[in-house]
Regions:
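Membrane-embedded alpha-helical signal segments
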Residues: 1-167
Length: 167
């Protein structure tokens, strides 16, 4: 049983396929690297896998066999979030951004420039997933941190501050 998995609907497989320009695994590795720097312990390797039971554009984050988060993205589209209270209404598919619960709109590449000029924050589908993954890991890291991880942290701290560890 893999500790952490990202399950992808078949419509999202291109996001993970380098031959099709997908860099999802590389981005997830970046999240893990950042997490080590910020939190001080290593997130276990993440396995990407397809899951034909999911809707085509659905993804799930699974930790030790338990679902911890789910979402849906639209590859080839851009998620526009009205973070500056713009009065501009964008044509597209209305949705809710999965991390912060903001109202958002999936827009085409043609609408992207208009959205940016109107003050919207615009991100691609893989960025939405990776941000969701990073925030989910931060929220659930207390479950991921093992006794062995704590021992490694203490051993490293002992080199720098032995008196603190002895207390």
């Amino acid at each position: 049983l893999d500790t952490l998995q990202i399950e992808l609907g078949y419509g999202l497989l291109s996001l993970a396929d380098p031959k099709k320009g997908g860099d999802l695994l590389e981005r997830v590795t970046g999240v893990r690297r950042t997490f080590v720097q910020e939190m001080g312990f290593i997130i276990p390797a993440v396995r990407l896998r397809d899951n034909l039971e999911l809707q085509p554009n659905e993804y799930r984050f699974v930790f030790r066999g338990q679902l911890i988060a789910t979402g849906e993205v639209m590859p080839g589209y851009w998620l526009a979030m009205n973070t500056n209270n713009s009065t501009e209404v964008l044509p597209g598919v209305q949705t809710t951004e999965p991390v912060f619960g903001l109202p958002a709109t999936w827009i085409t590449d043609v609408e992207r420039k208009n959205a940016e000029l109107a003050g919207y924050t615009v991100v691609d589908a893989a960025s939405v997933m990776v941000t969701h993954f990073g925030e989910t890991i931060k929220r659930t890291c207390y479950q991921i941190l093992s006794r062995q991880d704590v021992q490694v942290l203490l051993d490293n701290l002992k080199d720098q501050n032995p008196a603190l560890v002895n207390e």
